[in-house]
């Protein structure tokens, strides 16, 4: 990765624009002089070396300028910045900078003096205005200021004055109440942040065995009246659990008494901790009986200890010993049978009647067992090292010296980091024992070597342009948390139990075992309880505080010799990382940026490895089946069932409140998607690597290397250049820099994907899945999966192949023509005939992809087209094509799937026909139909003399309107649609560009008008959904609903809230738009509801299709509304797909939605706390929900016979 870094920066170009200065004499060689001398004796020309020096100085000056702005910034007193040592610029320019700073200082002092004088003069007037607002009427003003104007003389004036004063009093009262509410919310937010920090502190103390420290901090805050409000029942229970595990009964009782003293009532967890402690220390029977009696008086029966709590095995055993000692006849209740999902839509899936053909994996039991242990080793290691596919550099003397220098530096840094970490822990430990909840226990969660390893990894991947401190801190905090959670599972013997359970689970999946057919989740649950107690995730402020502390250690400890950066000057160390400020949009952002010399060192060394976190890489064995919110996917690494922005808690809360059986459908669908085994298409990968290592090819989606980035014509201007020329050069340099950074980003993404593909070549792997808040599914590994680009999809094949059968080859050919995009309006029979016509081109593409006629390169999806050409070539050349084993996934796409759902909801006959819900001989193309109708509107307007309509003659095409038609169903506005059309028009070289703005305005109106006529029910449903969401959010609630498969959904769009993490390098301000304590963001709530609701329907349709395909023995995966399976199984998948769409829309979806919204937002319990204005909104909401959109006469059963519904 380091070889891709781009070290030029537009912010420090001043040095580049100056005339070249004299050459400096070389410095004496120091400890690392070998590398410096090799740089001096490189093959680069003097001109190139001079340019590099100029760029280096520009980078250093950028750092200096940022530090000056940072330290001298006005209006940002919260930004406290520690002194960071920087390498000074050349001496020849120091006086100029000193003069500039001195001048700025004088100007600032003068301005500050003027401001102070103005403030002093206006103070009295300010308070007068604040207390008594001026009314610009002399007569009325007199009544408001009686001390200046006297008192009113007649009764009419007195009444008027009293009325005005009363009105102002009410206004002031309302303002005061609003201010009080705002302050109360701010205090609540601060207390919540503190509570999250304290709870994480206590849990870390218990995990690291430092219960006395937790006890000490708890007592310190309990005895302080102001601080006691921060303590919660969960915190007291956590400390009690720590003492229980140590068997320290006296200390536990002390905490129990503190809990009572704080006015809290003990819960089931409190009594469980006490009884565990008694079970561990063999407490006398009377004490245990008294505890049980008190517990039952509080309403908790002993059976609940074993049914309502998820306990570690050792804790459960100690608890049982204590209860049995007091009540010898007690027996824990047996495990309750798994509840059964009773959803109408899922009745066939969970029915025990009828034949089932659940597919098994193609691998035997021994192989799967071996793969499990390989994956377990990977997850215990927490990271994966992968060989980079970047072209290896020539091992010149310069490269060898750079690698030696880098290795020597890293050895020094590890020692220094270890020292600084120990010093920090000692300091924080002393503060913690003074009663402060510091980060000390967090720094004890992992070994010191693990912390150093995490920090050293940061230095390898930090980009040359730097990384925002908030982002770096968050990533560091998450890494520590994830490694801690894995380590906890090792400590509690969870790993050994998992190995035993997984061996039994593989009996269901292996190809050489015989087990009664069963869903993976059902089989896993039948093996007995394994689930460990859910780990409480740390809050974002806690993650940031820990990550920021680690980042500060890195800045403080990691230094390098100055000789690596400059040829002259004192032989001393300089920082490798600099903390600077930059502007991102309108916000000032703190950034950790590597020194340019360090970046150059990394680039020169060009190390051949990349390192990924475990969860960033596909799994080497089948994922764990999803059985709950906390159990599924990776073996040890924690994975969220519902992915969301960090800090979002409302989704988790709703899911936890769900009856377990309600989520069985989504859980089983995610498990089925994750159980699909994959392999890499090795032949295609070789071709891609050949192009990647050459110079890339953007038309084929292979990004070129940095060396292909555009360069400015010149780097410097001759002396005496005008300001205009300087400005032009600056713009040119900035443009080149922008393009180069974009290329770097794309190149890095391709590098990760191809390196992982090469790493997994000749291996079978799996992609565990989870879902977003709408129910849409996604693979967990981010860099290499089937949801990526054309190139990413082409590199993947099913690991299990299946014979083509009698019609499989035909479907391969049809799939090939679909990928080219050449015959979209033709029937399947015509596409098949066309494939036979171009068979020579297909075979030439397969045999000579880079040297032949390259027909495949003209396709819409070139790499997938090439992969299909190769598969077709192998099949037609095999002795028996029907017996050919095919691994290629064949796709079936929905026809504008969002509009299909809208048309089905509204039973819209015209709309249904446009999106292939009705049978037809040829596929209907809604985009072409809209373009045709818009052209008719244009012709009519042109006849009437409208200039823009006349200019657009010959330019209205399917491509111009497609994106707007596609996204209008997902809530695109006229403004957004205009921008989309404008972009398409600018791509037309022969379109008069002066008419682009006017033409895009005209076309977006016509597109919306066309859709209004074609999809009448669609617009009515969209309006109904939008209006409902508008009323709900104005009344103060976020919009909620439940999908047909039972997933509870809540839109996490709220007004922004801010939390500050102070101290250290800088204060970090965390801005969140998902804080449910804030009011809903009305605009996002109402605009988001229609598209999110439709997304929840398309995810329900996909999950139903996946489960029924699994029941029939098919391998099925999806990319949202694009369904994949083997060529031979396409007819079966299409049949299932249509059936489940009809079954889904046969449900009263809108009626059920209206009932849910009424119950949730219009019930007496919901509105009793609302204001009168908000109750009026609820009344209007009830009226809106009662008036459902009218539906048409479309017969939904026609979908069953529609060949092109998905095609």
Curated annotation (Swiss-Prot):
Keyword Transcription found: yes
PPR repeats: 232-266, 267-302
SMART domains according to UniProt: RPOL_N (SM01311)
Transit peptide: 1-41
Keyword list, A-Z: DNA-directed RNA polymerase, Mitochondrion, Nucleotidyltransferase, Repeat, Transcription, Transferase, Transit peptide
Top-level EC class: transferase
GO biological process, one term: transcription initiation at mitochondrial promoter
Catalytic-site annotation from UniProt: 893, 962, 1121
Subcellular location as annotated: Mitochondrion
Region named Disordered: 1-48, 82-103, 702-724
Main localisation: mitochondrion
EC number(s) reported in the record: 2.7.7.6
Superkingdom of origin organism: Eukaryota
Statement: the UniProt record of this protein carries the keyword Repeat: yes
Biological role stated in the UniProt entry: DNA-dependent RNA polymerase catalyzes the transcription of mitochondrial DNA into RNA using the four ribonucleoside triphosphates as substrates. Component of the mitochondrial transcription initiation complex, composed at least of TFB2M, TFAM and POLRMT that is required for basal transcription of mitochondrial DNA. In this complex, TFAM recruits POLRMT to a specific promoter whereas TFB2M induces structural changes in POLRMT to enable promoter opening and trapping of the DNA non-template strand. Has DNA primase activity.
Entry similarity comment: Belongs to the phage and mitochondrial RNA polymerase family.
Subunit composition and interactions: Homodimer. Component of the mitochondrial transcription initiation complex, composed at least of TFB2M, TFAM and POLRMT. In this complex TFAM recruits POLRMT to the promoter whereas TFB2M induces structural changes in POLRMT to enable promoter opening and trapping of the DNA non-template strand. Upon metabolic stress, forms a complex composed of FOXO3, SIRT3 and mitochondrial RNA polymerase POLRMT; the complex is recruited to mtDNA in a SIRT3-dependent manner. Also forms a complex composed of FOXO3, SIRT3, TFAM and POLRMT.
Name this polypeptide is given: DNA-directed RNA polymerase, mitochondrial
């Amino acid at each position: 990765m380091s070889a891709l870094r781009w070290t030029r920066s537009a912010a420090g170009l001043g040095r580049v624009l100056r005339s070249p200065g004299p050459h400096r004499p070389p410095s004496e060689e120091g400890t690392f002089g070998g590398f410096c001398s090799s740089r001096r004796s490189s093959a680069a020309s003097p001109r190139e070396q001079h340019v590099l020096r100029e760029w280096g100085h520009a980078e250093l000056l950028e750092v200096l300028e940022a530090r000056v702005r940072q330290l001298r910034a006005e209006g940002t007193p919260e930004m406290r910045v520690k002194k960071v040592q920087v390498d000074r610029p050349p001496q020849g320019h120091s006086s100029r900078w000193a003069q500039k700073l001195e001048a700025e200082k004088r100007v600032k002092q003068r301005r500050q003096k003027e401001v102070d004088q103005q403030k002093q003069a206006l103070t009295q007037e300010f308070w007068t205005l604040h207390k008594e607002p001026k009314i610009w009427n002399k007569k009325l003003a007199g009544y408001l200021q009686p001390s200046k104007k006297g008192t009113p003389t007649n009764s009419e004036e007195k009444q008027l004055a009293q009325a005005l004063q009363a009105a102002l009093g009410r206004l002031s009262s309302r303002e005061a109440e609003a201010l009080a509410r705002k302050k109360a919310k701010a205090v609540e937010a601060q207390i919540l942040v503190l509570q999250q920090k304290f709870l994480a502190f206590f849990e870390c103390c218990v995990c690291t065995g430092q219960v006395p420290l937790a006890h000490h901090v708890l007592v310190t805050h309990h005895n302080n009246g102001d601080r006691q409000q921060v303590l919660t029942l969960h915190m007291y229970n956590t400390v009690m659990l720590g003492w229980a595990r140590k068997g320290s009964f006296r200390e536990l009782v002390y905490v129990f008494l503190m809990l009572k003293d704080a006015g809290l009532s003990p819960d089931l967890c409190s009594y469980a901790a006490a009884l565990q402690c008694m079970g561990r220390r063999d407490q006398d029977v009377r004490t245990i009986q008294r505890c049980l009696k008190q517990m039952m008086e509080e309403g908790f029966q002993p059976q609940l200890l074993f049914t309502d709590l998820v306990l570690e095995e050792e804790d459960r055993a100690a608890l049982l010993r204590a209860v049995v000692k007091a009540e010898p006849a007690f027996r824990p209740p047996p495990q309750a049978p798994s509840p059964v999902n009773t959803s109408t839509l899922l009745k066939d899936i969970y029915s025990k009647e009828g034949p089932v053909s659940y597919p098994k994996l193609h691998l035997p039991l021994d192989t799967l067992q071996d793969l499990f242990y390989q994956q377990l080793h990977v997850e215990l290691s927490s990271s994966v090292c992968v060989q980079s596919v970047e072209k290896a550099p020539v091992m010149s003397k310069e490269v060898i010296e750079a690698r030696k220098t880098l290795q020597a530096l890293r050895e020094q840094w590890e020692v220094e980091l270890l020292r600084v970490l120990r010093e920090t822990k000692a300091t924080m430990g002393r503060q913690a024992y003074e009663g402060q909840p510091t980060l000390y226990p967090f720094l004890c969660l992992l070994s010191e070597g693990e912390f150093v390893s995490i920090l050293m990894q940061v230095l390898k991947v930090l980009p040359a342009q730097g990384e925002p401190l908030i982002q770096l801190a968050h990533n560091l905090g998450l890494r520590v948390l994830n490694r801690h959670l894995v380590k906890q599972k090792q400590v509690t013997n969870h790993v050994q139990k998992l190995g035993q359970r997984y061996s039994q689970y593989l009996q269901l999946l292996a190809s050489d075992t015989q087990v009664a057919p069963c869903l993976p989740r059902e089989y896993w649950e039948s093996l007995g309880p394994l689930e460990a107690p859910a780990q409480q995730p740390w809050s974002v402020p806690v993650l940031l505080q820990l990550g920021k502390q680690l980042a500060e250690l890195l800045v403080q400890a990691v230094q390098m010799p100055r000789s690596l950066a400059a040829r002259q000057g004192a032989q001393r160390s300089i920082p490798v990382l600099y903390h600077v400020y930059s502007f991102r949009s309108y916000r000032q952002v703190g950034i950790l940026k590597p020194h340019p010399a360090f970046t150059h060192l990394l680039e020169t060394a060009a190390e051949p490895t990349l390192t990924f976190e475990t969860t960033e890489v596909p799994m080497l064995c089948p994922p764990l089946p999803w059985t709950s919110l906390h159990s599924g996917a990776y073996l040890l690494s924690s994975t969220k069932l519902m992915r969301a922005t960090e800090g979002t808690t409302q989704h988790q809360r709703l899911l936890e409140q769900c009856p377990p059986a309600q989520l069985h459908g989504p859980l089983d669908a995610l498990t089925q998607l994750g159980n699909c085994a994959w392999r890499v298409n090795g032949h295609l990968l070789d071709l891609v690597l050949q192009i990647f290592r050459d110079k890339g090819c953007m038309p084929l989606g292979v990004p070129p290397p940095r060396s292909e980035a555009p360069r400015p014509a010149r780097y410097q201007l001759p002396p005496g250049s005008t300001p205009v020329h300087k400005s032009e050069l600056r713009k040119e340099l900035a443009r080149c820099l922008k393009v180069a950074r974009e290329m770097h980003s794309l190149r890095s993404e391709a590098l990760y994907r191809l390196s992982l593909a090469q790493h997994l070549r000749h291996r079978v792997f799996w992609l565990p899945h989870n879902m977003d808040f709408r129910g849409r599914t996604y693979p967990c590994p981010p860099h290499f999966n089937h949801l990526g680009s054309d190139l990413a999809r082409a590199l993947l094949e099913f690991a299990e192949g299946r014979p083509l059968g009698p019609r499989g080859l035909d479907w391969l050919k049809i799939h090939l023509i679909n990928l080219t995009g050449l015959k979209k309006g033709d029937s399947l029979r015509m596409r098949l005939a066309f494939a036979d016509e171009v068979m020579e081109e297909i075979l030439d593409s397969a045999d000579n992809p880079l040297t032949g006629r390259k027909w495949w390169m003209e396709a819409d999806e070139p790499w997938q087209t090439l992969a299909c050409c190769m598969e077709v070539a192998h099949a037609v050349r095999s002795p028996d094509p029907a017996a050919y084993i095919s691994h290629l996934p064949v796709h079936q796409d929905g026809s504008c799937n969002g509009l299909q759902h809208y048309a089905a909801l509204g039973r819209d006959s015209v709309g249904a026909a446009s999106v292939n819900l009705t049978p037809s001989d040829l596929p209907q193309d809604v985009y072409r139909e809209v373009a045709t109708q818009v052209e008719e509107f244009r012709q009519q307007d042109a006849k009437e003399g409208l200039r823009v309509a006349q200019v657009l003659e010959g330019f209205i095409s399917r491509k111009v309107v497609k994106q707007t038609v596609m996204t209008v169903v997902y809530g695109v506005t006229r403004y957004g649609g205009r921008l989309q059309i404008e972009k398409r028009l600018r791509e037309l070289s022969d379109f008069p560009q002066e008419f682009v703005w006017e033409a895009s305005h005209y076309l977006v109106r016509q597109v919306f008008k066309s859709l209004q006529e074609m999809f009448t029910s669609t617009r009515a449903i969209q309006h109904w959904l939008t209006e409902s969401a508008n009323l709900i959010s104005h009344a103060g609630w976020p919009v909620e609903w439940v999908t047909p498969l039972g997933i509870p959904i809540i839109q996490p769009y709220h007004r922004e809230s801010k939390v500050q993490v102070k101290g250290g390098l800088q204060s970090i301000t965390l801005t969140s738009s998902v804080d449910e304590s804030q009011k809903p963001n009305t605009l996002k709530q109402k605009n988001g509801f229609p598209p999110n609701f439709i997304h929840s329907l398309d995810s329900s349709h996909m999950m139903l299709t996946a489960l029924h395909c699994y029941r029939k023995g098919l391998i099925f995966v999806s990319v949202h509304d694009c369904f994949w399976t083997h060529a031979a199984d396409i007819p079966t998948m299409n049949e299932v797909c249509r059936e489940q769409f009809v079954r889904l829309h046969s449900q009263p979806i809108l009626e059920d939605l209206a009932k849910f919204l009424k119950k949730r937002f219009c019930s007496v319990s919901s509105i009793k706390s609302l204001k009168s204005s908000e109750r009026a909104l609820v009344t209007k909401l009830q009226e809106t929900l009662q008036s459902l959109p009218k539906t048409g006469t479309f017969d939904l059963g026609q979908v069953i016979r529609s060949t092109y519904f998905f095609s």
